[in-house]
C-alpha cells in the first residue's frame, strides 16, 4: 500500500471514517446503496462528507446496477453499499452480473460484530462465503488495522487486468474501532499489465499478412482500444464482427463492420465466419451465445487470441498464437508489422454472402413496430446518447437495429443476462454523464424486476427515457417455447395487463403512449427532447420473433427464421 507521506501529526479515524476518507481520496464522488443497522457507522461518516453524494436506491439490487451504470460508462470502479443479511444477499445478482461482464465494482457491506460471526446473529449471513464464486476477490475485515490495506488492494484489483467486482465485508465493531495513521494511503492504481514477447507479435503479424480470408473478432475486452482496433481493421482491410458486449467498437455503418455474430447475429455474418482462414480474436471469450456449437465454429480458421485473462486462452477454442496482454498494448506493437492489403477477392465473397443472406428489418419505418420504434428513437438523438437495455427480445432487437457508433455507448447484461438491469444501469449512466441523454429499452417482464427505481430516477430528475415494448409476455421464453417445445407456450404470458402509464406517473415520470398518438414520431421527438425521466409505451404483438436465431445447442450455420 503506497502512502502519500508522513503527516505532521498522526491522524485518528474510526473504521467507518477511514472508509469514507479513502473513498474521497480515490476520487469517488457518488456512492449508491441502502443503509441498515450493520452499516450505519459508515453512513454516519458518509453524512459528514462534502465530496461524496449518496444516491438512495429503492432496492439493493438496483444499487448494484446503478453502480454498474457508472462503472460501465466511466471505465473505473464505482461503489455500492448495503447492510448485512438481506441487504447483502439482494446485491448478489448485480455483483455476479458484474463478474461475468468484467465490470469494476467495489461492494461494501456491513456485517455483525466479529465476535458474533457464526452465531446466527440478527441479519447474519456468510457474505464472504456467498461472494467467493461471484467476485474477482473478496474480504472479511476482522481487525481495524487490516482496513487500509484491504481498501487499497480492493481498488487496485477491481481495475487491474481483467476488471471485476471486489466485495469488502466489514463487521460493525471494525467500523467503530479506531486506528491511528502516521501516513495516509495514496489512491490505488492499476497494476502494470502482463508483458508479452516480440516473437509472439511477429508470429501474429506473419499470420495476418499471409491470410487470404481473415476476420477480426472483437469482444468486450477491447473497450479501451477503439482507435487502434479501427486502425488495424482499416490497414489490413479486415471484416470485423463483434460480440454483444463489443457493439459500437466499429460504427454500425462502417464498411468493414459485419455487426454481431452468433445466436441473433446476421445470417450473412455467421456464414462469412465459416469461410475465414484466420480469426484475430481480441478481448473475447468464445461465449456459447456467440459461437454456437464449438466444434463447428470456424473449423478451417487458425486463431490468434489476445486477452488480458490467461484463463480465457485455450479454454474453449485452442489458439495457434495466444498472447496474454492488454489489447491496446498488443496492437501498438502489432500494427507497424501489418501490411496494407486490399483483399479484394475476400471482400467480394463477403459482399456476395451479404447479398445472398440480406438482413431483414420488417416495418423499419413504422414507429409502432419493434424495429421501427428503435429506428425512430435513434433518429431523435445523436451519438452522445447512452443506450441501456434489459434482457429479452427487446435487447436483441436493439442490438440488431440501433446504430451504435462508439465504445461505452451500449450498456447491456451479456454474460448473466439479467432482467431488471436496464433501468438502474440507465440511472447510473445518467448520474455519471449528466449531459447525455440515456435511453433504456425494456420489456414489460424486465421492467417489473426493478420498477421501483423509477422513484430514484424521478427524485434525482435524471434524463432517462424508458422505451417500453409491452407484449404482456416473457418474449424470449414465449419464442423458444413456440419454436422448440411440443407443448407450446406455458407460463410465458401474463393473464392481466398492467397500466404502466399510471405506475410511471405515480412515480413522477413524464409519460407517452405512442399507440394513442396521432403522430407517433412527433410525440416521440417531443418527449425525448424534454428533460427529466419519462416512460414511452408501445404495444408489441407477443407473436413477434427475434430472427434470425440459432437454436440452442446448434451450430451458427443452422439458423432459423427470416
Describe each model-derived feature in a short phrase.
Residues 2, 172-199, 203, 346, ...:
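Aromatic-enriched
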Residues 72, 220-304, 405-436, 449-451, ...:
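Glycine-rich, anion-gripping cofactor-binding loops and their flanking helix/strand elements
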